[in-house]
Regions:
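Extracellular/virion structural assembly segments
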Residues: 1-188
Length: 188
């Protein structure tokens, strides 16, 4: 949990959420662009307080070396003072969010949300910039999404769905919902 410790005492936090895109230029000057779906879509830059002395924090810093870049680590913004990065902006309650399900028809840069709450069709399920999670991976909503009259809604996100869904998955939006990590542990 060393990343969590560093996050909780950080002076600043930076998030790089850019897609991994490459461009090539052919001999006739035609530009070709392609996107690679990455497993590690977000890069975090945490600047800990200046008083984080190595001599006093060897255990925390050593626990960062063990997973390094090879193993998955999780950070929970909701349990620190940095929840403003992921704060949900829509009109659903936490219970309504937990009852919604991401559908198997989700693909590419459109996630499909079902089991919608009974709220007015003009109410916002998501606002542009909201963080949502499907399975293990997080996505950023790119446009406002209203409830509408249909049983499902399309939620446009900033990058393509990494793992296709084989069954419905509970919705996680902003600081609300239950996340299941690779080890099967849950946290909110």
């Amino acid at each position: 949990m060393s990343l969590q410790t560093i996050l909780s005492i950080s002076e600043s936090v930076g998030i790089n959420d850019q897609r991994f895109v490459g461009q090539t230029v052919s001999r006739n000057q035609k530009i070709t662009t392609s996107e690679i779906l990455t497993v590690v879509p977000f890069a975090f830059e945490l600047k800990p307080m200046n008083y984080l002395l190595y001599s006093q924090n060897r255990g925390v810093l050593n626990s960062l070396r063990i997973p390094d870049k090879a193993l998955t680590q999780y950070i929970n913004f909701g349990s620190t003072g940095w929840v403003n990065y992921i704060q949900y902006q829509g009109d659903m309650t936490p219970i309504q969010i937990g009852n919604c399900q991401w559908q198997t028809s989700s693909a590419n840069k459109n996630l499909v949300l079902g089991s919608l709450p009974s709220i007015a069709s003009s109410r916002y399920l998501f606002r542009a910039g909201d963080f949502v999670q499907v399975g293990l991976y997080s996505y950023i909503v790119t446009a406002d999404v209203t409830r509408g009259p249909n049983p499902t809604v399309n939620v446009p996100v900033h990058r393509s769905l990494i793992d296709a869904l084989t069954s419905t998955v509970a919705c996680v939006a902003g600081e609300f919902g239950t996340t299941i990590s690779m080890g099967g542990d849950t946290y909110t």
